[in-house]
Amino acid sequence: LVVGGSTGAVKVNNAVRAILPELLKKYQVVHLCGKGKTDASLNGIDGYIQFEYISDQMRDLFAISDIVISRAGANAICELLALRKPNILIPLSANASRGDQILNANSFKEHGYSSVMTEEEITPEKLLAAVDDLYKNRQKYIDAMDSSPQSEAVDKIMALIKDCSK
């Protein structure tokens, strides 16, 4: 699953498209490109589907995904941690943001939850190597997320809701 955020991520989209033939030898790719950023020439390629944006079916896409390439916004990283999805985070650059995504990504990398690439270092070759490495080592990332103090947060919240509803 490739998620570039609601507006898409041109550098990520371009890098994914450049390595698509190689990716499709091993993986099926669901690509959320951003509004107006799909590429009609790629429609109908076996193993690849692209959307501008998905909202209601996002949970289903996360459920079927083994790995995720994503921006590093607060909502995205919380979902990735809660769902234990091995991921490559590509934060918005400091020039295009307040820098919060960079802080989020670095924190997740330090905890062993994520692999991180900056926009400036993305090349098709580096992205392909990062995807292959993430997939090969995905259990390491899942184990790190399982050991997170936040790993039981959903269970604790559900227990509180049940207690309050009695």
Regions found by a protein language model. Give the residues of each.
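Donor-nucleotide binding loops and adjacent catalytic segments primarily
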Residues: L1-S70, I102-A105, E110, M117-E125
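Acidic donor-binding loop of glycosyltransferase active sites
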Residues: A63-C78, K85-P86
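A short, well-ordered alpha-helix in the C-terminal region of glycosyltransferases
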Residues: Q139-S151
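C-terminal alpha-helical cap of glycosyltransferases
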Residues: Q150-K166
